[in-house]
């Protein structure tokens, strides 16, 4: 198999027209729905186990409580008194990104390997950042944009809009690189190298790197929002 056989494109499964515009259901949409359904199933299962009246906490309860406590502590330590407002968003965001990143372990194409997905997530965070800024400063944001001199206004505006772009590119680039590396390995290496070795590659690119990128995106979200309240 040559390099020409390697395919990294997003494929369309079904196309239809709406108001004269051609729309399609593609790979990213399908895997995003699958990830969301898995996340919902895990949440419902965890809730069901927690609500059960056991004489002693079972393994599921202990694991769920440990994860929630660690996540809560992380958000509170980074956002302080403002943590309560953003707790659900940050934890849901990180859960979705992590499941998306590790979906490659199960033969799926990670939704976060699509720039549209990562930019959408970064855009939601950007709206929250700007909302916190406006709520805190009001018209004082104009003064911030003109700081330290009015001539810096264009640069400050560009730096504001660079936030969602840089956040989305960082996540997209790392996940996309992992899918490309794994795709090249499967396509170009001899058959005997595809036994055993890919498990270690998936463990690094999908799980380890995926966990790091989830943490980085979540931390940036918390830090950027918190800074707007200072």
What are these regions (language model features)?
Residues 1-230:
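Selective transmembrane helix interface/packing segments
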